[in-house]
Amino acid sequence: MYCLSVSHKTSNVVVRKKLAFPDEQKKTFLDDLYYSENISECLILCTCNRTEVYFCGDESSVKTVETVLSDFSGIDFDELKKYICLFYGDRALLHLFRVAGGIESMVIGEDEILGQLKRAYAFAKDNGTVAYELNMCVQAVSYTHLRAHETLANL
């Protein structure tokens, strides 16, 4: 799994606004990625402070995502690359846990992001662009978040 991230830590609000796609555009974006030759699963998380694309594919899939993101946002490819953080494998999964747990949020610990992630997953699932790997990752994040809150509530 890969995660291509542009967030409040790497970009300004002008850049982030260009990457905050409405649902119609998200659907087309996901379709363009999913029907490319090198991506088997994908979802996009857009909030006011981040746009992240989680995807499964080979090494060439990274350039595909960067290119499609550049095309959809209208941000020059080389300019966009300045704002991107790329995570792969275990680091991508760890990043997903950190994002969902609010650790990567502007206000550390806020929990609205988990709901946004669940909606992004449901949107991708409804559009047929997620399968086993991303499903397992999002389910693990949701379960861990629930267990952490239950445990903390009982302290």
Where do the model's predicted regions map?
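Short glycine-/aliphatic-rich beta-strand segments at the starts of folded cytosolic domains
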Residues: 1-22
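Residues that scaffold, gate, or flank divalent-cation-dependent active/transport sites
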Residues: 37-40
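Conserved small/polar residues in nucleotide/adenosyl-binding loops
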Residues: 144-151
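Short amphipathic alpha-helix segments
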Residues: 21-35
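Interdomain hinge/lid region at the active-site interface
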Residues: 140
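Short beta-strand
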Residues: 42-47
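Accessory, often N-terminal, substrate/partner-engagement and coupling regions
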Residues: 55-126
